[in-house]
Amino acid sequence: MKSTCLVTGGSGFVGRRLIQILLSHGWQVRALARSESAVRAVRGHGAEPVRGSLDDVASLEVAARDCDVVFHVAAYFKLWGDPAEFERSNVQGTANLLRAAAGASVKRFVQLGAAAVVMGDRAPMLGVNEALPLQERAWAPYSSSKARSEAMVLGANRPGIFETVVVRPPMIWGPNMPTLDHLVEVVKAGQLRWVDGGSQAMSTAHVDNVCNALELAVEKGRGGEAYFVSDGADSTLKEVLSGLLQTRGIEPPRTSAPLSVAWVMACAMEWIWRVFSRQGEPPMTRQMLRLIGAPFTLDIGKAQRELGYRPVVSRQQGLELMQAT
């Protein structure tokens, strides 16, 4: 029997799959649940639900009690929004969980990070490794908040006492991915154009590969370290999105716009939304374009050497599984 762990974000895309995989490997799994619907969801996945919130340190202390490991998967992810909300959820919420976990004598704290924490402006980034510094951009509140959160997590490492590790995937995909429904709607409405023809190289990470890396980080990760992980074989933006759309029987778009033009359009849309207090998200933002509009691939050599990481699901296998479900 493996250790007892706490999972945050257990009702979400990655969290629910992580719960299923951990249970199949013999873990005792608790899952933080901030609502009754979340309680039902994580219980349905097989975990023991614990009511609490990242805003409530007392509830986190109860949730982490007698746990050996914390998997911090929860995050506030949007491509547009109030920076204060990203700060509250992704930075202060993580600080609260770190405090509770350390106080409960948790041995390992593994955070699901984001490859985007090293993204700068629009320049291509190929074969990126962990030597690159964290980046913060005012127009990218999600990745900036994840960068601050990661720095805090790794800074909390105490060798042999409270060891912290961060796993950094690029775009996570797989069955029930929450962004695919929105992508289908946008394509059906004729609102999606490729940027620079969709030819930009990109790394991706199937949800099972991410969960595998999170578990390996507990067993083999060095405290105070971050690890890039991916599917191993890179693709282009057009190949990735076309493959996902085709699992729903949707033909990909054919039109394209240059990145330089799209960047100006995104700036204009952000200005309109900000000045006129428009509701919802702009159709295009600079953060969105940075995530998908320029080449970005990862060197996963460190994870391979130190964690023994190998992708467990290939791109083709993952697409076939999505097609079948």
Task: Kindly give the residue locations of the regions a language model identified.
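Mid/C-terminal beta-alpha module of Rossmann-like enzyme folds, strongest
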Residues: 216-282, 300, 316-321
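Glycine-rich Rossmann NAD(P)(H)-binding loop
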Residues: 8, 174, 196-200, 227-234, ...
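Active-site Tyr-X1-5-Lys
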Residues: 137-165
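Amphipathic terminal alpha-helices
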Residues: 298-306, 310-325
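Conserved Rossmann-fold NAD(P)-dependent oxidoreductase catalytic core, especially the SDR/UDP-sugar
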Residues: 92, 96-141
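Substrate-positioning beta->alpha
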Residues: 148-149, 178-182, 196-218, 224-225
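N-terminal Rossmann NAD(P)H-binding glycine-rich loop of SDR-like oxidoreductase domains
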Residues: 5-25
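NAD(P)H-binding glycine-rich loop region in Rossmannoid oxidoreductase-like domains
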Residues: 37-43, 47-92, 100
